[in-house]
Amino acid sequence: MTLARWWHPFTRKRRPASAPAPVAAAPARPAPVAPAADPNAAVDAPLSETQRNAFFCWIVAVPATGDAPDSPGLVVQHLMERLDEVIGSETLRARLLPRAPHVIPQLMRTLRDESYSSVDVAIRISRDVVLTAEVVRSATSVFQRGDDDGEIDLARAVTMIGTQGLRRAIANVVLRPIFDARGDTFSARAAAQIWRDADRKARLGAVLASQHGVDPFDGYLAGLLHNTGWTALLRAIDGFEDIDLSGVQLAHRDVVPQLMRRRDALFGALVGPWSLSAPVDQVAAEVGRRGIDAVESPLGLALRQAERLAAFCALAPAGQGPAAGVPAWATLTQSVQDCYAGLAAR
């Protein structure tokens, strides 16, 4: 083919330009998926002022404040200043709670191993009489719900309650002494209620944590240990011998929120350094810095919801069903309902 023939307009028609090759369409981006609605969000709302004050009076074992003065007075302002001093001082904080127990780190590491031997764990547990009793008690509770009529020894108890049950039994035994107090002081009078509430929060926290994608045991520990803030707060107040305070002054509607914020700060300052697990350390720092009402982490949300539900449980009149006392009860997940109902029946 000559160049002349190619270009001569009378001897060859110009062919229409070929259509450009189609450009491959970019793969369609999936539409953003909205986060699933939290079915337990109804219990995430703050307690009313009346509920909050009633719960404070229950857990701290002080009388209701129907005849409280309009102003809490300068003594309370001085109290807050002293509490802030304690919160900011590692030396002063160290006097409020026993040091974090380190007697069982090897056992805890063993329990995190999927291939742990129940016999090996039983041998370790058998060295502690109190822990042995707690493990067998937990297994007996499981046994009573089943049809097995065999005898429960320690090795069998370890197998029956499983890893999560063991961790909880160990946590209860090791951490319970932190909440104990004696004498006629604010902390001593409140000790039983603080522990009862901590146990409720721990059990609820384990269930709620799993629904927020968090290890249930981290939820259990966070719920159990959050109340160390109450214990530390009241022990600090007990130690202020130069400040004369009544329960009515502590339970004043303007004082309770200030005390609760300092409870959270003490929880963060005391529990954070214990290095129990990364999620627990992080939630302790978050609660300590922001307060329980402002947390955003998954474990923080589980802890806050557990705290709300535990408060409803404490405030429920005898004989009242959960549907009457818990907001939007029917919307809660079945596992949360079951856990709450079990606590209410105890």
Where would I find each of the regions flagged by the language model?
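Conserved alpha-helical "signature site"
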Residues: T2-L225, W230-G239, L250-R346
